Amino acid sequence: GNPQVMVSRACTGFVKRLFEMEVPEIRSGLVVIKKIVREAGYRTKMAVTSVDPSLDCVGSCVGPRGMRINNIVHELDGEKIDVIEWCSDISEFIARALSPAKAMMVQINEEEKKATAIVPDDKLSLAIGKAGQNVRLAAKLTDWKIDVKPYSEVSGIVGDVFEG
């Protein structure tokens, strides 16, 4: 039994190293990677935060004219990468995690650790993603179950809540 070393381009550690190499603010510790989730070859979602509130942590990762992130996307053969600013407010973090879709509202059920994200009808498929990939990765990133609903399906109910 010779020991074997497995090296994989599919693990999240690979993406982390690419960002460490490409982004000086990550190397220096000014920008911190909170969590990375991915479906290798398709999409990565990465939550970042900054130790300095005046520093744009997402902008640092993207780089001038998208240069830094484009180098990483190129290295990953065109895999999509969503860099999301981490947030301690869970409904805000879930809304951000559904990027590139924009949630209008996120309802939280603490007991079940379940969230319902309301999105504009024309953004429903973007929020869910191809074969559910976007919402699945958002759920892994936030550690919450996420249900995505179109605004038209809940507009009556949501309206009642706001008015009542």
Q: PLM features: what roles do these ranges have?
A:
Residues 1-164:
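RNA-contacting regions in translation and RNA-metabolism proteins
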